[in-house]
């Protein structure tokens, strides 16, 4: 590795680590305030909100990485400008495009490490966080999971326990469903079997219900069953993809497919992870171009503010297309790729004559 390459890599990584640490601390403090507000009426040990905030912070930091790279790039070039090192490189024959290339390769590999290791660690901590916090919410009385055997739901309503298994899930309906209802002592009350159950509301409508009580069987054309679940709640329970590692997402996708459950959100999460290293590179190039074009600005704060303002615009563009993807207005690939294409076009237009800067 050349001396200038080592210098560029070291300087950029130092800027990156400084910004990462600042973001981590800021997000931790914000999380802590949220947890303190949540537990203000609950008797818990002092360290517990501190601990919850700590294990919840990495996933929020992961979502902020594109902007961490953007600000890191701005600080990196500020350092080069301050000590006139960018001109020294230029006089030595090192073009700006070469600097961009070296750091783009670095960022790509850092991005792979972030997605492969940091994300998996963050998702495991997020899962731990959700599990610990669920003990202090009303949601702890029910549970829903998706396995190879379909959708399983455990619910407690009016002290009765419902164990529900459906082979598939489609259009506000559970299909091929078997329900076992127990009392609080786990004594069986009845079993219910149905091909279709309307779960639009929390009061389910069981169509052509086969009811088994002891050795007796009864068929009812329409049976109402009150639960804590409706279609929207079930969807929301499975919408927190950030608590799943990459391999867990792939496994969950297979289960979703067998259950005929929408793959949109899980595909969005997977494709987002795959494209994240490229997104980091584009954000680096974008920030680098801004810094090169504002090199003559004496006020460093103005450069940072310009970058932050433009990063907010990029965030809302990304969020807009992501919402279009989740609502299935456009397909999954388009919702992730279009913002990257827009950023690529902007970079391509602005990077002209960058070696003359």
Regions found by a protein language model. Give the residues of each.
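Mature-chain termini and adjacent capping regions
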Residues: 210, 221-224, 245-247
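General N-terminal targeting signals
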Residues: 183, 196, 216, 221-223, ...
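Structural signature for solvent-exposed beta-strand/loop edge elements and short helix-capping sites
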Residues: 153-200, 205-209
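An acidic-aromatic
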Residues: 210-220, 328
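Short, surface-exposed secondary-structure junctions/capping segments
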Residues: 205-213, 236-243
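Transmembrane alpha-helices
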Residues: 1-156, 231-357
